[in-house]
Amino acid sequence: IESIDIITPTESFSLDKSGEKSARNAPGWRISQVRIDDEVQTQPTIPFDIDRIATLLALLSPLYVDDIAYDLTDEEKNDIVFAGKVHFKTTDGEHTLEIGTPADLSKHPEWTFYGEGTRYVRFDNSPTIAIMAPQRIVGIFPSLIDMRSKEVWQLDSTSFSSIEIAQGNQCLRYRPVAPNV
């Protein structure tokens, strides 16, 4: 994917691989059309706000690849609750991305209700956890994405056939290589 265009009733903006977007995001916008590499995608069956749809699209895109990866200690692993799971199919098979939050937020002042700070991710059950740079995520997705019920987003794409968002409440994105590669 080279670019993503998001069109709303009032304005549109694009994301590219540099992380730049052409118009400022605003919570509450409703999506009206999505294009990936100039191809119009299947419309969602229920309305999504612009933050949520941007997050789902980012999960499918090799954007923002400046993640830092490291192996957690046993103590650190016990301190993390994996509250979200993304299951999706690509042309190279099925993958799973798990989204974690600290079990005790009082130990982690970098976390707030709105999701600012460190994210913990496990890709395909890998013991390696990726730390997401907070300014990169908060800058792109300023509000918390709350996905309390399962939702399915279908894309007419040669690279991705489907994505399923399960229980979870963190805004994250997928990159098409494991964090420890």
Question: What is each PLM-predicted segment?
Answer:
Residues 1-181:
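A short-motif feature that recognizes glycine-rich, charge-decorated loops
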